[in-house]
UniProtKB/Swiss-Prot annotation:
Family: Belongs to the glycosyltransferase 4 family. MraY subfamily.
Pathway the protein acts in: Cell wall biogenesis; peptidoglycan biosynthesis
Subcellular location field: Cell membrane
UniProt gene name: mraY
Organism: Bacillus cytotoxicus (strain DSM 22905 / CIP 110041 / 391-98 / NVH 391-98)
A Pfam family annotated for this UniProt entry: Glycos_transf_4
Transmembrane helix in keyword set: yes
Designated name of the protein: Phospho-N-acetylmuramoyl-pentapeptide-transferase
Keyword annotations from UniProtKB, A to Z: Cell cycle, Cell division, Cell membrane, Cell shape, Cell wall biogenesis/degradation, Magnesium, Membrane, Metal-binding, Peptidoglycan synthesis, Transferase, Transmembrane, Transmembrane helix
Domain of life: Bacteria
EC number(s) per entry: 2.7.8.13
A single GO BP: cell division
Enzyme class: transferase
Keyword Cell wall biogenesis/degradation set for record: yes
Amino acid sequence: MLEQGLLVTAGVAFLISVALSPLFIPFLRKLKFGQSIRDEGPKSHQKKSGTPTMGGIVIYVSMMVTTLIMAIKFEHLGAEVSLLLLVTFGYGLIGFLDDYIKVVKKRNLGLTSKQKLLGQLIIAIAFFAIAKGQGFDTHLMIPGTDITFDLYWAYFILVLFMLIGGSNAVNLTDGLDGLLSGTAAIAFGAFSIIAVAQEQYAVAIFCMAVVGAVLGFLVFNANPAKVFMGDTGSLALGGAIAAVAILLKQELLLVIIGGVFVMETLSVIIQVISFKTTGKRVFKMSPLHHHYELCGWSEWRVVVTFWSVGFLLAVLGIYIGVWM
């Protein structure tokens, strides 16, 4: 019965997101909350300048309302839901401030890297402290095995790394119309299946609410995008998916299910290291999706390819997390 309720959860979040977006997009235009495009980015992206941003607010509202309604209905409103909403709201707020400074204060870089890192660190510490207070253990499980290691306080460092790194990795992926919306829906969908297998229904409800919310947003975010989620959405989704992996004790599996985010991040790291040490670039541009654009791929082809890779990695992650 609850499994059917999870589909209803996704459906409700989808409908809320689809209903809110047409109302919110004109509001963003009226406020002149338009995306500015970097000059050093692909030239084809210049036509996107002025597209409303901060649409991640729609994703958050749709997800939060649906999660609370369904968690209460199925009597799964507990510490897990509170922690997930805390992280999503906290990282979403950081993203909102970053977007606000960019579009309203006209400061292209938004928050400074130190300001952003400090905010991410505070949210991550709060998450760990609350989880530890709820009796959350510090074991790390090797996916597909019964092997676990107690990391003790080193687990605290792992949590910080996952939440901060995860939010930034997902943020890097949000560079093409619909790219992040699609890959996020796939990844959260995979974790919802693992959550059901573990009978962690509160986490499953949250994941399916996110799936519905981002798919509803994708209707307006697919190429050509009528709205961007901005850092408001991408940082929130990144923090949320890392928190989900931590609560499910599938920390290492996040590397597989979130493989697209990992590849995007590695491409940036490799590019920076290569340029600083040799003066040469490995990729035509990073993150990786821009490299393929400059190789002549259409934006839609890049997006669908990355969705496909994300789907295959999600299937692999489900196989390891559920059946191995």
